[in-house]
Amino acid sequence: MNSKKYILIILLTINFSCNMSQKNNDGVIYASIETNKGIIKTELFFNQTPVTVANFISLAEGNNKEVSDQYKGKKYYNGLTFHRVIPDFMIQGGDPTGTGSGSPGYNFKDEFVNELKHDSPGTLSMANAGPGTNGSQFFITHKETPWLDGGHTVFGKVLEGQDVVDKIEQGDSIVNVEIIRDGSGAKRFNAAKVFTNHFKEEEKLKKDAEKKLLKLKEDVSKIHNKLKSEANETETGLKYFINEKGDGDKVDESKVILTHYAVYFEDGNLLDTSILKVAEKYDMFDNRRAQGGGYSPIEAKVGPKDMMIQGFKEGLKILNIGDKATLFLPYYLAYGETESRGIPAKSNLIFEVEIVDQK
């Protein structure tokens, strides 16, 4: 055998062995969920979703330091019920009130991992009321539920006892949750510490993000002020600036206009956008919106009877396909003198738009 090939094979073998060894050293963490119908044995993905698993384990073992005082030092899940059961969908538990609205006294972040999907029966996942609202409630699926991907954190899977999952009825109880650690990495995983540290890290990230956002808003506001000083003005008081001229036909008010937009307050604060990069820059990315195709051009109708804000319609009708423009709407061409949809009364708005097409 050629010596170079031999060396390459040896190196690949060593590398593969090291990877396998590292994986074995990480170990596995199991949760044995004893119910009144039998035992459900699950694996917890502590490497991929460490915060979510740390939350579950520390609640189960009674050493979670973030819970409300009434739950401290108690094995949180013991004695709770499966308060929500939907046949051929899932079983849900972990609510101390049994109503679906209870919590341990805090919320924490989502941990979405591309490789972890709701792609089979026995998926263990977090229930929530929207982004960043995880608490103690979890569910286990009866079947694959792909529409939940990107909205709920998958943090484990059923290894044994799927038949028990399928027998659970509303009101059935969790008798005990036992956490089993197998392997050195699993035994080193300090759930209570990991979970508490997560809040400290999140607080630091939040402060850093606030500083970054403040600078971004100031920069955007300066740009808008400069453009406004150079903008054209219509008889109604709308001002517009063409950032980039397209070469398409003029917008036809009888057609549906496909347009990207980002709408801002005058201080540079972003209200809403269809543009993914802008949402990410402002830390306003919504995974559920992305899953539903929400970062795509909207369909706008700009005829006289169409229900869109007046200044937005007027601004689009000035433009051609391919144009990128900034529209400055005085409050009376936007949402008017009263508060609307969380927008303060008499708010002047700024739209950045791109006319993509019309049909």
Protein language model regions, located:
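Cross-family detector of peptidyl-prolyl cis-trans isomerase
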Residues: 18-359
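Bacterial Sec-dependent N-terminal signal peptides
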Residues: 1-28
